[in-house]
UniProtKB/Swiss-Prot annotation:
The gene is apaG. It comes from Pseudomonas putida (strain ATCC 47054 / DSM 6125 / CFBP 8728 / NCIMB 11950 / KT2440). NCBIfam families: PRK05461.1. GO terms for biological process: error-free translesion synthesis. InterPro entries: ApaG_domain, ApaG_sf, Uncharacterised_ApaG. It comes from the Bacteria. Residues 2-126 form the ApaG domain. This is Protein ApaG. Pfam families: DUF525 (PF04379).
Length: 126
């Protein structure tokens, strides 16, 4: 969305969870920490999430749900909300992308896009 009142920026850091993975059974676990930064001029509440999780074979899992990790945080201008969660895929490499549905203090609903980010076992990519 180009309206500067509704500017939400999303940053992601991922980590492979070797101890929770089982490569022999095609189970690769990853943690991710996401920071949702409100760079707009209005407070906005994170209502829901929509994820597309794609494994290295191109198989896509779609996930929708209310809030993030049981919360629907209200994020004031200049403030951020950080949370951690995880995903399990069946290949050594995959991607996640999606959006958050936000509700601004002026009553407008808008989507905050989450750009694609990579899930990868260390050494899986050259």
């Amino acid at each position: 969305m180009s309206d500067p009142r509704y500017q939400i920026d999303v940053s992601v850091v991922t980590r492979y969870l070797k101890e929770q993975s089982d490569p022999e059974n095609s189970r690769f676990a990853f943690a991710y920490t996401i920071t949702v930064q409100n760079n707009g001029s209005l407070s906005a509440k994170l209502l829901s999430r929509h994820w597309l999780i794609t494994n290295g074979d191109g198989e896509v899992e779609e996930v929708r749900g209310a809030g993030v990790v049981g919360q629907q945080p209200n994020i004031d201008p200049g403030q951020s909300h950080t949370y951690s969660s995880g995903a399990v895929i069946s290949t050594r490499v995959g991607t996640m992308q999606g959006s958050y549905q936000m509700f601004a203090e002026d009553g407008k609903r808008f989507d905050a896009e989450i750009a694609p980010f990579r899930l990868a076992v260390p050494g899986a990519l050259h």
